Structure formats: structure tokens, C-alpha cells
Amino acid sequence: MRYTAVIRTLGNAGMYYQKTLESIAQQTIKPDRIIVYLAESYEIPKETIGVERYIYVPKGMVAQRALSYYEVDTEYILFLDDDVYLPPEAVSRLYNELQQYNANVISPCTFQNHKQRTLSKVFKAITGKERPMFTNNRWSYKVMRTAGFAYNNNPSKPVYESQSNAGPCFFCKKNDFLNISFGEELWLDKTYYALPEDQVMFYKMYKKGLKVLTSFDSGIVHLDAGTTMQSNPERECRLVFSEYRNKLIFWHRFIFLPDHNPLSRFMSVLALGYALTIQFIKCIVYFLIGKSKTAKAFFDGINDAKCYLKSDEYKSLPLI
């Protein structure tokens, strides 16, 4: 098996990036090449292992991943962010699990939702963002009608099928990735934060007929998990705007439009309406405690999404 490791970066991950490079070099199955897709106008980082090739591309979480990969001449690609640690056997394990389960895409569980505190699980379930699944022995993640996701609350097997995943690392054939036409989802990059770009990508893989897996025994670690999104008032507003603008577009494009069953569509409308109502109630609280800008960001995000859904650009996108 031959593969190429590709990394998207702004070049400012520092020691995390160095650890990523070193862990790639220590793989028992080494990549043919390491190609780093660096956002335009950013400097090449000083961290190195001496074998990386840099290619400048437009900036964006989607733009730096939805590429043609002409430079890749291997059948498989290991996709990485710039802050991921891989144990020496990681790629070998991912490849073997891919073959064992006759699947197309595999991603490690780098965000362990099932290990959250109970109060956090309850709160997120109430908001419709994410909820635990207690009796599911097939899926690790499933996309919900609210445009959120459900996660396996007690994973007891090394590998599960999935409809979504975290995106700092995944492994698949080059052609399988190209066939999902991820460049059609560049609308995600038009906000301050492209979230939920990972969910959009993996769910599109699933909708296109690819079998997606989550590995719980790879040992792969997202080194910067939970630190890059530390909140301040301005960032919180940008996150709220981005989340609800992109969530509404995702819901309409991936959940509502592809569903031709009137009753099922109605259930999806009710589910989204519930999630938005809960957020509206939160906005009232924001106003009462003096966080009116955060509340405004929610309404601005929804309005921006509505405008985009009416645009010629959106209407020209191929249907899922």
C-alpha cells in the first residue's frame, strides 16, 4: 500500500506542527511524500523534518482541502491538520481496519463526545446540537434532523460505521475523495469559521455511497483540541454567526432537499424549528444579561443563510 500524507495549515501551529511531522516520519508504513498545502500569503513555518513539499493554495478550511491533488500519485491519501499526533502503527491500523470492514473512508475518534460530563451532555441534547445514543451497536455518529449529530455513548468495539466524524485526520483513496466534489461546499468558507465543515464532508461521503468508519483504537490525538476556540466576546459572536448560518444551509441542502417524503420533510422542519426555538430562548437570556451582540449574531447568521438560499449561486449547486 502506497500513500501520500497531505497537511493543510496556516503555518503557525508551532510545536504541534513539528510533532505532526515527526509522527508521520515514524510510521511503520511511511508515506511516499509529505505535501503541505499552505494558505497564500503565509510564511513557510520554521518547523521541519527536511522532506516536506510546500504548495500555496487559497486560504480556507474547505479551500485547503477541496483540491485536485494533481501532485499526489499514490492510491491512498492520509489527510491531516497541522496539530495531530500519530503513533507509529497508526496508518497501518487505519489501513487494516479499512480493509477488514470493506470500507472507503476511516477517521480516528479525536473528539470523545461520549466522555463529556453528564451536565454537558444533557445541555447539548436539549439544544439539539448533539445527543448520546445508548443502544446503537452499529453507528459511531449519525446526523440528526436538527442538523446536529448523535454519538455512540458507550463505544465497546474498535470500529463503527459513521455518518460524520471529526476531520483533523482521515484516510481514504484519492479517487473516493475527489468523487464527492467537496469544492461544491465552498460556501462554508464565507464565514469567520467554516464549521461544521467536517460534518458536511463526511456526511456528503455517506450520501454519495461511501462507507465511512470511525476508529476508536488508533491512538491518534488531536493535539490542539479545545484550545483554538477559547472564547472572547468577539470570537463568540463570530462563532454563533458562523454556526447558525452554516447549519441552516447544511440542513436545507443535505437534509431537507434530498428528502422527497412529505411526512419526513415535515418532521425535519419540526426538528429544525425546535433547535432554532431553543437558541431563540438563549438569545433572550443573552439580552437580559447584556450580551446583545451575541444574540444579534444569531439573527444575522440566520438572515445571511436565508439570503444565500435564495441566491443564484446556491441554486446552481448540484443537488445531493
Outline where the language-model segments fall.
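A recurrent flexible, glycine/aromatic-enriched loop bordering the glycosyltransferase active site
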Residues: 138-146, 151-172, 193-194
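Acidic donor-binding loop at a coil-to-helix junction in glycosyltransferase catalytic cores
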Residues: 165-167, 188-203
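Active-site-adjacent helix/loop segment of glycosyltransferases
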Residues: 207, 211-290
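Glycine-rich, basic loop-to-helix element that forms the pyrophosphate-binding segment
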Residues: 56-72
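Conserved donor NDP-sugar-binding/catalytic core segment of glycosyltransferases
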Residues: 89-136
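Short aromatic/hydrophobic "clamp" motif used to bind/position activated sugar donors
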Residues: 77
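Acidic donor-binding segment of Leloir-type glycosyltransferases
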Residues: 21-56
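N-proximal low-complexity "stem/linker" segments adjacent to membrane-targeting elements
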Residues: 1-25
